[in-house]
Structure formats: C-alpha cells, structure tokens
Amino acid sequence: MKVNSKLLLLIVSLCGILTILSFRYNSFFDLVATTLKRYTEEYPQEKIYLHIDKPYYTAGEIIWLKAYLVAGSHHEPSTFSKAILVDLINQDGQLTFEIKLSADLGFAEGQINLPDTLHSGNYALRAYTSWMRNFNNAFFFEKEIKIWNPGAKLSNQIAENNMQLDLQFFPEGGNLVEGIRSRVGLKAVGADGYGKEVKGIIIDQQGTFITAFESNPLGMGAFEFVPEDGVTYFGKLEKEDAQPFPLPQASKTGFVLNITESHEHGDVLIRIQTNEATLNKSVALIAQCRGVLEYILQPDLSDNFALIRVPKDKHLNGITQFTLFNGQVPVAERLMFIDQEEQVTLEITPDKKVYSPREKITLRIKATDKNNQPVQGNFSLSVLDAKQMLLNPNAEHITANLLLSSELVGLIENSGYYFNPENEDRKQALDALLLTQGWRRFVWQDILAGKWPALNYPIQQGINLTGTLQDVLSKKPIADGKVTLLSNNPHLVFLEAISGKDGRFAFHNLQFYDTADIFLQGTNKRNRKTVIFEIDPLDKPTFGRTVQPLALQLTDYEKNYLERSSERQQIDASYTFDERVIILDPVDVLGEHMSDEPFKIYGKGSRTIRTSEIPGAETFFHPYQYLQGRVAGVQVVQNGPYWNISIRGSAYSSVGAGTKPLIMIDNIPIESSSLESINPLGSINPRDIESIEIFRGPEAAIFGASGANGAILFYTKRGKYRPVTREGAITFTSIGFQAHREFYSPRYDVKQPRHIKPDYRATIYWNPNIVTDSLGNTTLDFFTNDNESIMMGVLEGLSFRGQPATARFSYQVEKR
C-alpha cells in the first residue's frame, strides 16, 4: 500500500488529556475518565504473590511460604483483606490441603505440612482472598510445584517426546485488514501446555509461499505481511507432514494498530492505519495502566495513517493497555510493557565468600531505589543447597508476577525471563508475549455500559461463620430467632446474633488461630429451644485448569535431591531428641494392663490405624485427618465445618444404597443423618483417638445393611464415649488462621545434644520476615550445614510503597 507522506505527529503535552480534542468527543472522554476512576475506587484489585522456600519437595516435608498481598494500581500492601486462603491441589484438580493466613498490613507467613503418604505428582499452589472472588478466578495466584514420594510409584506420567503442537496466530491490534501491512504474533504450545520452539512458513490457499517465521525458545514470535483481497492464509511447520494452521481472515475495512518502542529514548511510537474502504474514521486512542488513565488521543486519519510519539514518562511502570475506539466501540487493542526501572535494588553482602561446615554467616542487606535512596520494605529469604536444587534463572519472582503475569490470563511460562538482564532478547521476547495475550481484568463495553462486577464476596478481615436457623420439626427458617456463640480460643468469646426473615444469621471477622471449639445455642422468638442449625459449608472456588503430570525423566539435580531426601529420612529415624524429656529412675508398677481387644467387639478390620504412629498428628484438628490420604480407597473431603467421607468400591450389595460408610465411636453408631451436617466426631479432640478400624466389602457384612458402604470405627483412649445432646445447640470445631511456626535454624555456636545429628538439609535457611530500616539496611545471621556445596540465596519482597524487589547471591561451603 502506498502511504501518503503526510504524517500526523502528536506530542503528548504535560496535561493528562490533549488540548486538541474536539468538542463532540468531550462527553465520551469524560465518561471514560469518570468510569475508570469509579472502577479503581469501588472495585480495587487485590493480588497475591507467594514466595516459597524451594521449587520441589518430597512427601513429609514442609512447604515454607510468605504471602504478599497488594491492592490498587500501585501495588501497595493491602489494608483491605486480612484473610488469605492457600490451597494445595493435586493433578486431578482435587483439594489436598488448605490453610488460612492472617495478613498483617499485607504480609503473612505460613507453612504446609505435606503428608508422608502424598502421591508423587505435580501440584498447584493457589492463593486468593474472598474479595478476589468477585472477579475472574484466573487472576488468583497459582504456581505448580513438584512433589515426590520415594516410597510410592509415580503415576500419570507424561512422555517428554509427546510433541503434538497447537499453533495460533494473533494479528497486532486484533485484526487483519486487506491491503495494510500487519504484524502477526504466533504461539506454539505442546501437549504439556508449554511453549515449543518452531520454524515454518506462511502460505496462501494455493500453497504459494508468502513469508517465513521462527519462534523463540518459549514458542512465540512475530512476522509481517500484507493480506490481499479474498485470500486465505495458513501457517505450516517445517515437518513435511505438518498440518496447516489457519490465520484469521482479513477484513475489508477496519483499523490496524501498531505500537513499538523507540530505540533512541524509549518513547512509545503508535501507528494507526486504515484504508479507503473504511468510511467512519473518527477514532480515539485510550491508554490506561491498572485502571489509571494515562492519556486520551484523537488522531487525524483523513490520510488513512497517523504516527504518534508519546514520551516514556507519560506511562506507569508495567503493562499499558492501548484501546482504539471508533465512536464508542473498541476496534483494536494492544498491550505494551513500559519499563520505568522502578524496581528496588537489593545489595546482599555475605561477610565471606567461602565458609566451613556449620560456620556462622552474617548477611548485610541494603535496599535502594533507582535514585540510590534508601527503601524500607518487607522481604523473605531462602538459602538452598545448589547441588540438590536447580534454581531456574528465569523462574517467576515477585517483580515478574506483579508487573506481568498477574495482569494476564493463563500460564506465563518462565516469566522471570523477561526481567533477567542476561537475556539479551528479553525485550523482543516480551513484545512477542504481549502480542499473543488479551486483556481480561475488565471489558470496556461492560464498564462503559455500567455493567459492574457483582460483589457477592465481601472483604474478609477474619473468620466468618454463617448459617440458617430452622424449626426442629418443619425445617422452615426461623425469623427473629437468637443465636448465641461461645468459644474459648484464645479467650472466652460470647456473641449474639438475630436471624433475619430467611432465618439467616452471621458472625463476621472472628479472630482465632489453629482451631476453636464453637458452641451455638439457638432459640426462636418465643425463647424456645426447638431449633436446629444448618451451618454453611465453605464455598470453595473451582479449579478450572489442568495440572500437567510429572515428566518421566528426572534431572541430575532432582535425582541428587531425592537421594539426599532418603538419607535425611534415615537420619531422622535414627536420631530422636526431645529436650523436654526428664529421665526418671526405674519404678515397679503393680497392676494389670487392660487390653483394648475385648473392647473392639467387631474385631479387626482390613486396615488398622494406630494414631500414635501418625507423624504430625499433633497438628490435627479433626479425627478424619488420620484417614486423609493414608488409606487407599478412603476419600476424605473437608468443606468448611462439613466433612464428607466415602470408601470407594466398598458396597457388597444394593442394600443401604448411598455413598457414606457407617461411622462408630467406641462401638456407638453415629446416625447417618448427622453426617449431612456437623457430626459428633467434630467435638472430639483428635488426640483422644487411640485407633481406627476400617471395614470394607464382605468384611463389613457383620454390620448388616448399615455397612453396605463399609464401616469406620473410631476408638477413644478412654473407651467411654457417649453422645451428648443439647436441645437447640451444637458443638463443633472450626478452623482458624494458621498459627505461626518458626523454621528451625540450628545455632551451632551453642552446643546441644541434637547437634550430633548429621545436617544435610536442602533448605539451609528460611526467613519470611526481614524488614529494612529507614536507611534501607538490615543484618541477619545463620549457620551453614554439613553439605559441601555452593549455596544459593533468593531474596524477594516489597517496599512499603509497592515496589517489588528480587535478588540472588551465592557462597561456597568446603572443609578447610
């Protein structure tokens, strides 16, 4: 196409909106400005980033984590939500573990104790707040981690040579227009969901060669061509038998939006083109970043072409969304990353470069901004054995997450690649990435039409308990009834609520840690206790994507890590230390030992669980946790105060149809109806359970029709359980915020008996709460372990003004 030499060059003035705007557009521009302002004020966007201590684990280990919760356009630590929910999800999309963290001004720390019976596989860590659920779940924090169980076989593996590819094409701005040169992004994805490097050509429907293309190692790239009238185009990979992949069909009219970065000053160059066939050429270009309006332009397209140069400093740091409107309809859109280099610089200085095993290390940390001014912030540090842990230099970190991947939908593979200065092509790769991405945080048509997100989930500052008060006979909701709540964790709590017309009652923002025994007493408006409670289950969001199975091949680092893990397990089994134990002189005890066998009138089941043999049981808050993930075929699912349990393939007849097994406590059956709500087991301290017997199949025939779906028998240590019933009342255990647990970092300068134990930990040091002072400084110390290796440290965090920071350092440990 021959382009008229008359180009429109617009230099953005210091004001937010250009003075060249015509009067007839002012009302629309005002609508855009006021709408964006309302959106950011009334619908503030929260984000979460999790820093974990290492990239992979074995069953029985602990995932140490730090949560960074930010809100608003400038990523400042959030003061809105306090409750952060963290889920661990397996390859089948099932919830495996969940914790609640209490954020203090946007920062929280926690841990996930992995059961030693966990199956090997890829798992997903997911984190979100109640408020975030009002928007697209795709913007929850998600991270895949590998977990191995050396004692269990690896299932659902994926072969690494499965190279089935999907190739997609994305015209810049969204459209191809006949006769206008266009830039087209491409993305090649394999069967495992990750990008694959490809080469190929573009052909038309006659097989005529048009141009060649080549992707980067992440499977993305771009090429240019001029689509002709009525021609269909295809992309074809190098392989002879490769199937053709169609390009979008070019339109006869429309607009092409091209945005690049000036190599001289980093300014943004915007090119807008149309053709003679396009009649209405009145357009406006709107630039916004995270809901902040940067500017609005009204270019002149009377010559079908406009060139606009915008100074770099007119943009915020991060992704700017450029949207071209024709009238009030968006017709083209482009994302561009503007790097204002506002990230915090972290200088980490060990007092030495080489240390001996078990020697003290002192680290000095200094945080500064781009003007070398001190920065106060909150950070977390992980130090790992580099022989056991391969740290991907391009892995996601807090800077890449907040500025890039949290703004986009879908997996952003190796997002740290685009921020690693060692990658010379990172800017080109980032531009190719954004060519293949679409904006999803809000849709222009919806917000301009006043279609705001439905706020079904409130900002949550604590633990919420809600439900319905019902009549004991009719099961109808009771209005104006009184509900009294009593609890004693950590102090005595006495609260009252009045049920609404629909019988609903609520207690909001309860503050307790670990678990709390909750007692609810209800009465109707005549002060009678003829009521029952229907407590709301925890409403968990669905997990919409697929977690890819583990690859067959292990890296050398992973093999070394698993070997070391087995050694650590053997060492842990050989050395037991409890400094609280006092050894007494031997004494003779006269009496008889009472066997629990006669008490078990139904005998032994197909599986017996001795609770004393379950590691980590001291953290359990419900007896069902003894079964969770430990007995093949027994599935335990928690949903708020409700617990569902089933035995797969246990039914031996059609009698007693259903899915729930018979549950007994000290030989006393729990009625099946009670299992639909909060069952009596919830009021029993898990540490009071002595053993559990599981019956399935023909073994359960001893229970008659009641055992058609199997039977699970719990035996307490006293063996004298009797159900306690109170009219109009229930008692249950509720999960609170996770209590803080400190990472064990031995102090080898003070001799202790436990120090004879070999120390081959993969995570040498974990500190989730590092705060710099007014000068941007802090100092910390820890000790090396017995590994002779290079140790790698990863420091991440956030300034109190919302600037992300990440840095790495290393030191050597060797015997001298």
Report residues per predicted region.
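N-terminal, cleavable Sec-dependent signal peptides of secreted/periplasmic/extracellular proteins
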Residues: 2-583, 805
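Short, small/polar-rich motifs associated with maturation and membrane association
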Residues: 302-304, 318-321, 326, 330, ...
